[in-house]
Curated annotation (Swiss-Prot):
Changing Y264A: Strong reduction of activity. This is Ubiquitin carboxyl-terminal hydrolase 12. The keyword Zinc applies. Residues 39-369 form the USP domain. It is found in: Nucleus; Cytoplasm; Cell membrane. GO terms for cellular component: cytoplasm; cytosol; nucleoplasm; nucleus; plasma membrane. One of its GO terms (molecular function) is metal ion binding. Pfam families: UCH.
Length: 370
């Protein structure tokens, strides 16, 4: 058995090496970006949900730069962030241009910190992304809180802030956080009330044969509150019919869009996948911004896509496609391949049966040009 395992592992390593060599040749020495590395990640038992998100985040350049900068700071106690920083640093400082890295330390820490991921079952890539970003933000805020305990910041300046004040935004917020405004207009007195809500990613409903722009417009459709759902108007001091809609007040540097492809079917008593064809362009401008939006004309470029392959949330596979400089790459765990930009259309979804196996965009990462 041990001999068979060794032979199998050796064959796997040879295959990885061949793939890496082929990729390097395909890109060519003159076209290969300076100081860039393309490394696949070893799958430790259904960890493709994690690998695909990590690859997408690595090629969100502002995020990568902040994680690498964190690595250069004085050593902190081990956390999910230190493990992520070690992984990114390991990729960025490799002598080889292409290859494979085992993210074992990160996976071990992830399973230790959250029982949801402490198994060998397939997990949801969006849940992992959400958990990772919020955990990193919590770690950074806790570290800043510790630095403030003596009333001094790392640069030696005295901190006079109230300890009960809202935590300072972290670089996670600076990169991914946007703001929604929930507007409600009373149909009796026409008074408009609004409430702001921050987000790190937007989850949008999907429909057949549409585009991400259409999905975002649907996200901001006007909803009528009536019957038992009437709105309590402070001006009228009674429940009234009202119009409610959600608009984007502040657009983030990197816009992460989650396509809600998994829906619970009562007749099946389980979740199934909506493999609908949803076109996502290489360039994007949002039109559902509020009147007082701080940056309504922001243009975005697609930089990464986490793709779900399969027919349901608990089975299937995740891969990532990313833009690096002027070309696109596909990361499938330890395999890395160069693909044409036109090949992205293959990941829009299907025009036929919703329950069929499909390779369809699940999380889109758009980076602002400014």
């Amino acid at each position: 058995m041990e001999i068979l395992m060794t032979v199998s592992k050796f064959a796997s390593i040879c295959t990885m090496g061949a793939n890496a060599s082929a990729l390097e040749k395909e890109i060519g020495p003159e076209q290969f970006p300076v100081n860039e590395h393309y490394f696949g990640l070893v799958n430790f038992g259904n960890t493709c949900y994690c690998n695909s998100v990590l690859q997408a985040l690595y090629f969100c350049r502002p995020f990568r730069e902040k994680v690498l900068a964190y690595k250069s700071q004085p050593r902190k106690k081990e956390s999910l962030l230190t493990c992520l920083a070690d992984l990114f640093h390991s990729i960025a400082t490799q002598k080889k241009k292409v290859g494979v890295i085992p993210p074992k330390k990160f996976i071990t820490r992830l399973r230790k910190e959250n029982e949801l991921f402490d198994n060998y079952m397939q997990q949801d890539a969006h849940e992992f992304l959400n958990y990772l970003l919020n955990t990193i933000a919590d770690i950074l805020q806790e570290e800043r809180k510790q630095e403030k305990q003596n009333g001094r910041l790392p640069n030696g300046n005295i901190d006079n802030e109230n300890n009960n004040s809202t935590p300072d935004p972290t670089w996670v917020h600076e990169i991914f956080q946007g703001t929604l405004t929930n507007e409600t207009r009373c149909l009796t007195c026409e008074t408009i009330s609004s409430k702001d809500e921050d987000f790190l990613d937007l989850s949008v409903d999907v429909e057949q044969n549409t585009s991400i722009t259409h999905c975002l417009r649907g996200f901001s459709n006007t909803e009528t509150l009536c019957s038992e759902y009437k709105y309590y108007c402070e001006e009228c001091r009674s429940k009234q019919e009202a119009h409610k809609r959600m608009k984007v007040k502040k657009l983030p540097m990197i816009l992460a869009l989650h396509l809600k492809r998994f829906k619970y079917m009562d007749q099946l008593h389980r979740y199934t996948k909506l493999s609908y064809r949803v076109v996502f362009p290489l360039e994007l401008r949002l039109f559902n911004t509020s009147g007082d939006a701080t940056n309504p004309d922001r243009m975005y470029d697609l930089v990464a896509v986490v793709v779900h392959c399969g027919s349901g949330p608990n089975r299937g596979h995740y891969i990532a496609i990313v833009k690096s400089h002027d070309f696109w790459l596909l990361f499938d765990d330890d395999i890395v391949e160069k693909i044409d930009a036109q090949a992205i259309e293959e990941f829009y979804g299907l025009t036929s049966d919703i329950s069929k196996n499909s390779e369809s965009g699940y999380i889109l990462f758009y980076q602002s040009r400014d």
